[in-house]
Amino acid sequence: MASDLDFSPPEVPEPTFLENLLRYGLFLGAIFQLICVLAIIVPIPKSHEAEAEPSEPRSAEVTRKPKAAVPSVNKRPKKETKKKR
């Protein structure tokens, strides 16, 4: 019985160039996704020079007129009538 067992490695074909390209491309994609998720989670401290410049445009945003008030829930918007041809 022991002589009947075959312990030789299975015959597996070598991966082709496209299979290798797909494999390593998927690895690179996964690493890129991890870097993107970490960039969102981990905040990066800004330098003092970068903080001074954005403060100027913010003051311009404050001077803008506020948007129109949201219409009340009870009022229905007017229906636009289609032109008859």
Swiss-Prot record:
Membrane-spanning ranges: 24-44
Disordered, as annotated region: 48-85
Regions of compositional bias (Basic and acidic residues) in chain numbering: 48-64
UniProt keyword annotation of Secreted present: no
Record's compositionally biased regions (Basic residues): 75-85
Domain of life: Eukaryota
Primary residence: membrane
Compartments reported by the entry: Membrane
Keywords from the UniProt entry: Membrane, Transmembrane, Transmembrane helix
Gene Ontology cellular component terms for the protein in this record: membrane
Pfam families xref list: UPF0239 (PF06783)
Topology term for the membrane: Single-pass membrane protein
Alphabetized InterPro entries for the sequence: UPF0239
PANTHER family, sorted: MANNOSIDASE, BETA A, LYSOSOMAL-LIKE, MANBAL PROTEIN (PTHR14409), PROTEIN MANBAL (PTHR14409:SF2)
Family: Belongs to the UPF0239 family.
Name listed for the protein in its UniProt record: Protein MANBAL
Protein source organism: Homo sapiens
